């Protein structure tokens, strides 16, 4: 029987709504994909029959968030303000409520099969728009889904949408420190901490929670996995409770990372042995205190026995011993332990060819399968090393049949450009999730394992390291939030395509204009492959500075140390033998069908060849190229593709706001220059090591390049750059004179318009200044203040400045003046004079 509703026509006046609308007008990226831009009249016309009133059945913070959000969305996209319903009557309405509440009034409703957080949206016979779910969080997700459909201009006239999440765990991690820094964060300081204090009243916490909820994220861990034990101090619990309150209205559970040594370091015990009853009691008391303040506290994340973090091995105990003692304290409160499988020895003997970091996660956790309590989740990185641009799927994902597991992805671009390079990671994650591990000799794609159905596990799922910061657009690069959006959409539905996700995000974040949506989504979809091409192809890993900033080329930093990210390049060939027959045996950790494909170089995909096999430079790939020629070709192709991004972006000028356009263009131009740094470093290194020339004559030959050290120098001094491949010719020049230095040469080419490209170094501890003169006329100047991570001259500090459209005549003197600042010595590497093509 259908009951009737009456609705008061109340006007909503909510400060959050006003703030959000102002942020949309500013177009800084603060609103992410929740801009709710106004639809054109033709598109908006299809929503004329949308009810003008909204009612929530219930009285909870989450439902109020849903109602407020829908009003905001309709106001933004359609220019209407929904009335808030209060009583029974005849007029149709948008009705928000859980299924039990909805069915009190709509007893003839035939509800679909919904799981926790799943939702249903449909029009009933009286044109009420029913927005319902099994729980209140699901109603919120349904509301965001409805708002998204309208913002995308999709029809809802015959909507009957049922959506269940693929997995119950859809969490994000922040690696924020109490001092306000963020480990592997590239977008400002922490929104949660500063100077040892918790920023519980920071309004960005609420804004972040709203963004997460809009794409179905249901948990957030707010502090670094390299955890400071003092976060557990009693004085911090009230502030953590305030953050949990902000999260709660958006359906997000708060969790924190804990240090296993806490019972000893802050608890007054002389031990943290997980099998000591006093340690178990300490954890129980601490957990009880947390739940007294935060009844819906989510649980703990644990990193132990890894990279200097103490763990159970200190007492001869296992990860299961450590996880279970905490899990048992959490169990009465329904809390969870996320125990990271990132456990390895970073003091491996590199001289032993059988040592292999890739084997560590499987070796440490597979023997313990079935020994973890049922509220423990093993958090497993997608690959066996460390978030590289390309690595195989972790075999551990298919090996834990009696243990809950979650895949760990990384939104923050630690090894994939640190939000200075465009790198849309969804295509990579799709490959991982679609990969068939053939567990139990049956078809078992990773995405099916993560549902929990493959091995009948109850709390499997997804975790991503995000590391948003105080930058207005959350992740620094205006295009980087596409990775957070894409992660969350895949965690909900891993069968979505990368193309669908890219187009959705672009339309919501920038514009539904087909030119904008097509252009930006096209750039996104090609960017991961582009980044891989100019960094580390063929499974070599990223070839970056692994012992320092994790940014820029530094090939030998991977070798001859204990970190285990070896590529084993020598004068004969490159790659690490991980076969069972002759290598480390890593390939044997996979199920037989997968292991067989990786055991032989002939059946290993080219993209992973050097990860599994040491091969000669003359080895012929499936593509028909030799390994060495592929190295040359891929790096030149990648740099060329990166250069096209800036040109493509310029076709969008005027199609959306100037601020995001200009910031993105500057980053894409920087990426184009840094891709050349990568190209030259890798090609020159392997040219020298292999002694095999580039068949196309590019590597080692740079037409139009003038080395800085060959110019006429005034107070500039020549320096050797280490590693040598990070500067053209292995040398650069720097200025130590406070009032500046200069370098000049005479141009001997044909007169005309040229682009002057200067490869310079930008150090973070100072802002060096540069000026370019042609025939004593100032043609360009800039300050090196791009906030690169570098503290010395090298691959992570090298950038390229372009001065286009400069008229140069034969005999003109070209002079570069540099003025140092602090530790930035206005250094540069070379100049290239490139003819400006007429169009």
Kindly give the residue locations of the regions a language model identified.
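Bacterial N-terminal signal peptides
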Residues: 8-18
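Catalytic domains of carbohydrate-active enzymes that cleave complex glycans
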Residues: 443-702
